[in-house]
Amino acid sequence: MPNTHDTKNNVSPSEYAKFDPSTIHQRLNTSLSRPQLNSDGSIRHFLGVEGLNKAQLQAIIAKALFFEPSTRTRTTFEVAEKRLGANVLNLDIASSSAKKGESLRDTLWNLQAMTADIFVVRHSASGAAHFMATEVTPDIAIINGGDGWHAHPTQGMLDMLTIHREAPRPFEELSVAIIGDVKHSRVARSDISALQTLGVKDIRVIAPRTLLPKGIERFGVQVYEDMNSCVRDCDVIMGLRIQNERIGSPLLASSSEYYKQYGITPERVALAKPDALIMHPGPMNRGVEIASSVADGPQSVILKQVSNGVAIRMAVLALTMEGQRAHQANRG
């Protein structure tokens, strides 16, 4: 999906040229499998769900289900790392030296001096994790903790785990409605890609036109104009947060008008299937994106999404560690 986000403050000019916003998503989605996988198909870096096939996504879910009984705390990579005994460095580049003008490559070289096996990277520039995976030394693996508008693959996979565990029907039989700020949401991109890979054929999206990427129909989703029609007979209703911090100018008339047109209300939930799941990646804007009675209601699995996050992150860390060992064995 096109990305017009200005990322020049986060990478050097030469690096930025490699990630032209007009082509970033198409280019990344067609190339992610190359640095992401070893020759045997094991995961070398976890950069996005787009580069993985159905069996590989199912393997992540299966690994997460193995870890699930021990996950009772809030979703953080730190919890997962401690339970696995992994030597992991968590990086929020936006709050590091990049703010002072240091290039992404220089940041990476400095970080490599710290003895860590895996870097979990969050960056405001689309493609940053992909860039680091191509530049990092062979003994370090990269996990994408969210890059710009491009992808949030661990959130996407914890959403798939939640649907797998809670939905009464298999992926192939589900209708999923995604509501809200798709344009600025890396979660939406990862969810749409994962849902399609796992066999969901009916993916619906609705938002004000200002919050939809241009040409979104090309990505195999149905765009709706009417909220009631969008959620009717759905199995999963997924709200998205309005990304105010990524919106350069006002794109909404008002919060109250947005809620009136696109809010997930009890009346609209009643139009979906009786056992429909209510999801949201958080944080929620109650009374804008979703009614409190829905967020806290019996069909909501929002807190289960949170608790499933630890299992997914443990699964991703474990599979990445296995892939890293395989990569090192092949080199040796």
From Swiss-Prot:
Pathway membership, UniProt: Pyrimidine metabolism; UMP biosynthesis via de novo pathway; (S)-dihydroorotate from bicarbonate: step 2/3
Q: Which InterPro entries match?
A: Asp/Orn_carbamoyltranf_P-bd, Asp/Orn_carbamoylTrfase, Asp/Orn_carbamoylTrfase_sf, Asp_carbamoyltransf, Asp_carbamoyltransf_Asp/Orn-bd
Chain positions recorded as L-aspartate binding sites: 100, 186, 241
Catalytic reactions of this protein: carbamoyl phosphate + L-aspartate = N-carbamoyl-L-aspartate + phosphate + H(+)
Query: Which residues lie within the region annotated Disordered?
Result: 1-20
| Alphabetical keyword list | Pyrimidine biosynthesis, Transferase
Biological process (GO), any one = 'de novo' UMP biosynthetic process
Task: Tell me if DNA-binding is a UniProt keyword of this record.
Answer: no
Which Enzyme Commission number(s) are on file for it?
A: 2.1.3.2
**Gene Ontology terms: cellular component:** cytosol
Could you tell me one molecular function GO term of this UniProt entry?
aspartate carbamoyltransferase activity
Task: Tell me which residues bind carbamoyl phosphate.
Answer: 72-73, 122, 152, 155, 282-283
| Xref: Pfam families | OTCace, OTCace_N
What does the annotation say about its assembly with partners?
Heterododecamer (2C3:3R2) of six catalytic PyrB chains organized as two trimers (C3), and six regulatory PyrI chains organized as three dimers (R2).
What the protein does comes down to:
Catalyzes the condensation of carbamoyl phosphate and aspartate to form carbamoyl aspartate and inorganic phosphate, the committed step in the de novo pyrimidine nucleotide biosynthesis pathway.
Which PANTHER family does the annotation name?
ASPARTATE CARBAMOYLTRANSFERASE, ORNITHINE CARBAMOYLTRANSFERASE, MITOCHONDRIAL
Q: Which family does it belong to?
A: Belongs to the aspartate/ornithine carbamoyltransferase superfamily. ATCase family.
UniProt name for this protein? Aspartate carbamoyltransferase catalytic subunit
Annotated source species: Psychrobacter sp. (strain TAD1)
State the gene name recorded for this protein.
Answer: pyrB
